[in-house]
Amino acid sequence: MINIRFPDGSIREFEAGVNSLDVAKSISPSLAKATMAAYIDDQLKDAKDAINSNCELRLITVKDPEGLEILRHSCAHLLAHAVKELYPNTEVTIGPVVDNGFYYDFSFKESIGEADLPTIEKKMKELAKKSAPVSYRVVPKAEAIEFFKAQGENYKVEIIDSIADEQMKIYTQDNFSDLCRGPHIPNTSVLKAFKLTKLAGAYWRGNSDNEMLTRIYGTCWATKEDLEQYLNMLEEAEKRDHRKIGKVLDLFHFQEDSPGIAFWHDNGVRIWRQVEDYMRASNNKYGCSEIRTPLIADFSLWQKSGHASKYAENMFATKSENRDFAIRPMNCPTCVQVYNTKLHSYRDLPIRMAEFGIVHRNEPSGSLHGLLRVRSFTQDDGHIFCTPEQVEEEVILMVQQCFEVYKDFGFNDFAVKIALRPENRIGDDETWDKSEQILKNALDANNVSYELFPGEGAFYGPKIEFHLKDAIGRSWQCGTIQLDFSMPQRLGATYIDKNGEKQVSVMLHRAIVGSLERFIGMLIEHYAGNLPLWLAPVQVAVMGISNNQDDYCKEVFIMLEKNGIRAKLDLRNEKIGFKIREHTLLRVPYLVILGKNEQEQKIITIRKHSGEDLGQMSVDDFCAFLDKQIQAKE
């Protein structure tokens, strides 16, 4: 007999060889039905793995994040199974879990399009209903190679060859087998709520020199209700797509001459200026001086900073006068050069620098996505140089600033995470203990709840991440606050302490909105293009019922502009209904409509974008009304 301890501290006795599924059944049939896998002494295992000794056990169900991930990974296998049934000559490659779903890459011999997805999905449902048990076997590497070679699965053979392990795990359901580390669901019958969503091209191993594969995306959920809710969200997200809205509102465009880099139009630049000016004012409030540093620097700087060894593939390089240069992928090393121009005393610290720094990263073309994933973007970087004693207070201020910014932009629902030390890191445990505690203390001081994520910090320090939730429930990873033990040492950022000794400065990195391009894309989708008044590129459209009001329209327009309102004058010889519809589609917050009565009484009639009639008032009262909203960030 063996003793199994549960998360609540209780201990129960079982026969040796029992598995997690049996344990779940002994508690309740419904728990067994929901069990996907289990943690056995902190190791994630298949639900049918035998337990032969005393242990701690935590059952993983579909309600747990790990359970949902296992469900989705198993659904990717079901997709591959269905494809092999329908297209036997297809070679399967890899099928990982991604946000809210999964994908699988295939090498089809036939031409496959979006129209084929319903057929594949139907086959998946047929296979799931078979309730096939899912099992695995562990075999020597050579045997796994022979097994997949015999099936003509050359990509699997290549994958196995690239793995250092001498033992391979092969999962089987019905007549389909796949290479996988697992764990997987106990039975295919639990796969009931899934949908194939789209098809795309993807190079094998992300290398454009390799074969172009067909990538099929899908989503999978614990219940049909969850699936329906997600599909509704996707439908709403499609309506809010910033690329479509950006075209309608004439904000920006992309073209193949400059892939992954936006061409900003006048309306887009107006939004950009509001975001940048707001952040500049916020930085001033929190004591940051603004700097501007070169986009290009000698490659030796990137070698010293460590970027050359870690980001070389994502860096754009150039040559001039027999010297190697790189376009910066990050702003930190050039910021340190500004700090290093002076000798600093501990009395000078903290020194806070902010920069709207343009960076370039050679992202794969297949990953580019409007403003959300680009090759050139402007980062609202901040770098703080301070003493160890000042770190906690600086982080407290940065957290406070982040919260102010997000709330002003209309994001009131967010999650905060602390990424803790990874296995491969620099610095001793004592330093990491102190650093991680500082981040926790700073969040506690701001009354912020947070989650801990062990192993997800950078090798040079822990960090805080801010994840914003938008109007339709999507989560966006946005700001970061990062402690850095490495770069100040590498680049010689020092100060003189009170004993006259030279010390390495502590460096804090922070980005609040992050990439301005991405943040503006987020804002467009969050508000579905209906930006709040203070951000709207055009705040008021002025129009007359007939051309008889042209002079009065011009007079009102000039008064609005003099009061700092971004107004548009529409004197076209069109029907008033046409003008109203057009400016409504352009998401202009307020429409000023002028007729004979307004002209004679020197008043204006105001209509909101929503269609609500605000009645009549003087131009001065309207300007005061608008200014109140703008100041309140409404």
From Swiss-Prot:
Matching entries from Gene3D superfamilies are given as: 3.10.20.30, 3.30.54.20, Anticodon-binding domain, Bira Bifunctional Protein, Domain 2, Threonyl-trna Synthetase, Chain A, domain 2
Tell me where it mainly resides. cytoplasm
Instruction: Give the TGS domain ranges.
Output: 1-61
Query: What's noted on cofactor binding?
Result: Binds 1 zinc ion per subunit.
Which SUPFAM superfamilies does the UniProt record give? Class II aaRS ABD-related (SSF52954), Class II aaRS and biotin synthetases (SSF55681), TGS-like (SSF81271), ThrRS/AlaRS common domain (SSF55186)
List UniProt keywords, sorted A-Z: Aminoacyl-tRNA synthetase, ATP-binding, Cytoplasm, Ligase, Metal-binding, Nucleotide-binding, Protein biosynthesis, RNA-binding, tRNA-binding, Zinc
> Catalyses which reaction?
tRNA(Thr) + L-threonine + ATP = L-threonyl-tRNA(Thr) + AMP + diphosphate + H(+)
**The EC number(s) this enzyme carries:** 6.1.1.3
Recorded hits in InterPro entries, A to Z, give: aa-tRNA-synt_IIb, aa-tRNA-synth_II, aa-tRNA-synth_II/BPL/LPL, Anticodon-bd, Anticodon-bd_dom_sf, Beta-grasp_dom_sf, TGS, TGS-like
Cite the residue spans of the region called Catalytic: 241-532
Molecular functions (GO terms): ATP binding; metal ion binding; threonine-tRNA ligase activity; tRNA binding
GO BP term, example? threonyl-tRNA aminoacylation
Q: Which cofactor does it need?
A: Zn(2+)
SMART domains linked to this entry? tRNA_SAD
- Report residues binding Zn(2+): 332, 383, 509
Annotated Gene Ontology cellular component terms: cytoplasm
Its biological purpose is as follows: Catalyzes the attachment of threonine to tRNA(Thr) in a two-step reaction: L-threonine is first activated by ATP to form Thr-AMP and then transferred to the acceptor end of tRNA(Thr). Also edits incorrectly charged L-seryl-tRNA(Thr).
UniProt similarity note: Belongs to the class-II aminoacyl-tRNA synthetase family.
The entry describes its oligomerization and partners as:
Homodimer.
What is the name of this protein?
Threonine--tRNA ligase
Q: Which gene encodes it?
A: thrS
